[in-house]
Amino acid sequence: MPVSALSIVNRTKTSKSRKGLVSKSSKTTLESGFQEVLEPSFFDRRADSVARELLGCWLIVQRANQHQEKHRIFEAEAYLGPHDLACHGHMGPTRRNRTMFGPAGYWYVYLCYGMHWMLNVVTGREGLPAAVLLRGVGATEGPGRLTKMLGVTKQYDGKRLEPISGLWIERGDGVPRRQIQRTPRIGVSYAKHWADKPLRYLVNPSIFDSRTVIRSGL
């Protein structure tokens, strides 16, 4: 996939994190080159392992102008399956959650509170509902803000994570375990003893170069 090599930084913006994690620097740069696209086998594992290892990876979105934006993942939550009372699939399949019961490596997108789209990737064995919710990428914190920034809606639900779908994940540099924080998931107080499980994984995004990287298209 030949692309032209460009390298410019054109703007800087600082925003305050709602959780006080960091004041993030948002820059834009143009570059060439592709990293390794994560295959379904990467996701065909326990959701907590996948969530942890997604930190530092790149979420890529194909824009209408054929440019591709790369955003570094810094926060994700794991939902482990039918025994996890915070998991959408613990009561069985429905029209809304049926994507969770499919094969690993597919997007699961649903509407929360009637207004915010949530972006998840299906993990684990087909037939057992498990997924990882993406909560923070680049300079954007919060799953609703994330999908709004990316332009993600229901059209991605059930699509495989691959360039042809317009939304995929590429391998990053990895994050040392000592830099990863674990906390209970957000907004799952209804899930009894599962509400306190430390299945939210995050790193301070200041450890990354938080630029939004733009590549020319295919």
Residues covered by each model-derived region:
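Conserved, well-structured core segments that form or line functional sites
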Residues: 2-218
